[in-house]
From Swiss-Prot:
Its main location: cytoplasm. SUPFAM superfamilies: Thioredoxin-like. This is ClpXP adapter protein SpxH. Keywords: Cytoplasm. Interacts with Spx. HAMAP family: Adapter_SpxH. Adapter protein required for efficient degradation of Spx by ClpXP under non-stress conditions. Interaction with Spx stabilizes Spx and exposes the C-terminus of Spx for recognition and proteolysis by ClpXP. GO terms for cellular component: cytoplasm. It is found in: Cytoplasm. Belongs to the SpxH family. It comes from Staphylococcus aureus (strain COL). Pfam families: Thioredoxin_5.
Length: 268
C-alpha cells in the first residue's frame, strides 16, 4: 500500500474560509470507482467508531477531470450521474449521504456494475433520503456550482489523487497534514493522537450484528478492519448470525459480502 505523507502550508485552509472546529477535521477526497477508496471507507468507519468525540470527517467526491469524466461516461442523464447524485444527496445531511455513497460503492466495486437510475434510487431510499426531494434537487444548477467549490478546495489543498485525507487541528494557524494513498490503520491513529497532543480514549465497536444492520452490506475485509478479530473467529460469529437468519452471505467477483436480513436502522 503506497502513499505519500506530506505537510501542507496553513494557507490552504484559510484561503477557502473553513471555520475551525473543536476537534480534528478530516477531509476525505474519494473516487467512487476506486477500490482503494472503497477499502479506505472501512478504515474511516473504524476511526469514526473509536474516535468519534475527537474527529469530524467531511467526504468530498474528488472533482478532478479524470473522476468527472468517468462519472459522465457512466451516465445518460443527471439521474444516473454519481457525481451529481452525491451532491443532491448531500443536501439531506451528512449521515444520509455517507450511507448513500457506502451503498453505492457496495454496488459498483464488488459487482463491477454500471451505474443505473434504478440503482441510485434504491440506494437513495435505503439511505433514508427523501426520493422526491432528491429528484427535485438533481435538476438544480446549484449542484454544478457546488462541484466547482469542491474543485476549488481540492486545488487549494493540492489534491492529486484519490484517496487523499487532509487532517487539521482546531487551530487554523497550524499546518495541515495530507496523506495520499492507502495506509495501514495505525498510521491514521498515530496522526490523530499527535494532533490531539494529549492522551485520548478509544470507544469500542458496536455488536457485530448491530454494525451489519447499520451498514446493510459489508465486506469481510471491512469487518476484519473494524473488529480486529482472527478471521477464524469472525467467520464463526458470522455463521452464527446466518443460522439465526439475521444475515446472508453473497459471493461477488471481488470477494464475499455479508448482507443484513434485519430491518435497517433509520438514519437520524
Amino acid at each position: 500500500m503506497a502513499g505519500e505523507l506530506r505537510i501542507m502550508e496553513n494557507k490552504s485552509r484559510e484561503d477557502i474560509n473553513l471555520s475551525p472546529v473543536s476537534k480534528i477535521e478530516i477531509y476525505s477526497f474519494f473516487d467512487p470507482f476506486s477500490s482503494d477508496c472503497f477499502k479506505l471507507s472501512a478504515i474511516l468507519s473504524k476511526l469514526r467508531i473509536e474516535y468519534n468525540q475527537y474527529i469530524r470527517i467531511r467526504h468530498i467526491l474528488n472533482p478532478s477531470l479524470k473522476v468527472l469524466t468517468k462519472c459522465q461516461a457512466q451516465s445518460t442523464s443527471n439521474f444516473d450521474n454519481i457525481a451529481l447524485a452525491y451532491k443532491a444527496a448531500e443536501l439531506q445531511g451528512r449521515v444520509r449521504v455517507e450511507r448513500f455513497i457506502h451503498l453505492m460503492q457496495n454496488e459498483i466495486i464488488p459487482k463491477r456494475d454500471i451505474i443505473t437510475e434504478s440503482m441510485i434510487c434504491d440506494c437513495i431510499q435505503n439511505a433514508g433520503i427523501d426520493l422526491e426531494v432528491f429528484k427535485d434537487d438533481l435538476q438544480k444548477s446549484k449542484l454544478t456550482e457546488s462541484l466547482k467549490i469542491d474543485l476549488h478546495i481540492a486545488r487549494e489543498m493540492e489534491i492529486e489523487q484519490a484517496p487523499s485525507l487532509v487532517f487539521f487541528s482546531e487551530d487554523v494557524h497550524e499546518e495541515g497534514l495530507k496523506v495520499e494513498g492507502l495506509y495501514p490503520y495505525h498510521i491514521y491513529t498515530y496522526i490523530i493522537n499527535e494532533l490531539m497532543g494529549k492522551p485520548i480514549e478509544k470507544n469500542l465497536p458496536p455488536k457485530l450484528e448491530t454494525y451489519i444492520q447499520q451498514q446493510q452490506l459489508v465486506t469481510m475485509e471491512e469487518l476484519l478492519t473494524i473488529y480486529e478479530w482472527p478471521e477464524k473467529l469472525l467467520n464463526k460469529e458470522l455463521k452464527k448470525l446466518a443460522i439465526q437468519q439475521k444475515i446472508e452471505k453473497l459471493k461477488y467477483p471481488d470477494g464475499d459480502f455479508w448482507k443484513s436480513k434485519m430491518p435497517k436502522i433509520k438514519s437520524k
